[in-house]
């Protein structure tokens, strides 16, 4: 795969740009041409900030009949978040269940888990999920903001969005003098970083943004080396005051830590194994993602505007590992699931929308109508028929070479083609001075064509989904709104792109949600709080009438929950950000080969989560922050026999503005060195551990 020597490139570009930059320029910020840009530039977001995930109507959080969260890039990077997943799990009710098999990016939200239920977008564009895996974006350096919509969102983004939608908005070109930021960092486990952020005007009509980031580490487990490179580049041409074009290319190249988890010993976690890595010596994990987009924005007249996004996405992923570890008497570890896997995925798509300000029955109204088309190719190579196993000592770390007993060896196994087409519309109508109706409809059609490259067989299926949403927002005061909504969503019984022939026989699962809530800003904008309550029912799950019966689409799962947030600026430099969530999720009707699981809680779903972040300006030059993340106990198996313990992890940081253009920072992660598991596999007998205590020192220079 292509590599970018980003550390060398960062320095070279910085030297080239230094000649044209103005010394002492202000930090790289988006222009305040929209509310979104202003909020991001100030490093804050509030209930008056439009959310890119909650609607395409440009509504603020107060105007949206749904539970949303917005994090500016400054907030994301200012809270020790290395990944987008780290950032969004500091918002209400979302927890990480990442593992190498899902790209380290899977989430749990509102009682529903994995990439089939929690959708992740990049600047509003969806990369279809292949075999349960998403590997982009790489890090948070190029992130301008992250918007979260909780609850069903198929009416906005199509099937597969029952739990939540996360939209990552990258940094955008801006007008004005060229401004640059260089960062160098070093910390525990030989972790190092070199990064560049540059942007500004090249002429009256041309502006750009360029972000480069290279990171590497020796890792906190044996043989845990990792490295990543990320590139985000965009060029904007303002053809006129009403017409603009933006061409962008984003790329990530990763060699993540080759750690597949830690086995329990006689059903118990042994702390002495924290740094052990039982993978083979020649294990490999590599991800390469590329996204190229052309965005056109046209203000046709005062009432009508159009936007088009044409995009090409390419992904290559490769794994070669011993994936499963089981403790054996005599303190041996049996290794199995020796698999070599490659994904090659290409996606071409286009989304066209029109936004119209108009009157509807004499009432002020705004509508968005659009069409979405995607063509996705997915090919997979593997050796899943391998049954090779071996044993290694519990003391120490793995070792040995990868071996496979697949009779066909490692090679091409399947090729899939999916064509997706959708029509969608949204509307907001001001019914009275205080009451507004927000509604939406969407029709999706997907045709899936799967080719088995071993026996040359072929299977295809067409699926369709109709979804809608309706919500009322009552503005009690300009700073307080009450809302209620009803929304639906659809999901494949697994990821649509890689449904096997048996799974293709089934229809889409269906979910419906009712939600009520309130949102309020107070103390002249120095504080805000939100509260949401919801009920979700998902039907047509794969289940059995009895443990020995054949699989049918007769299962049901539900969840009820509460979510609350609080943001306060207390004066004297104190800032408080807190949230908490509670969910009661269960299988209403679910039987599998192992037994009836009705009444059980789904795996990887914590009943309670909470987050707190406190920051204090110690002086004009020094700021400090400390935060805690709490995740309740979760079940690691559908029988609810194995429990992953709850955990609380504390992080802290301090920043010192040494000079006008030089800033030093210190990040402390897992301050109290808590040992904890984020998720499990092998029926809960193998835990994926969180990283131990670490520190990281940064130096930022702006010019």
Language model: regions and residue ranges:
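Outer-membrane beta-barrel translocator/receptor signature
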Residues: 129, 142-144, 155-231, 239-243, ...
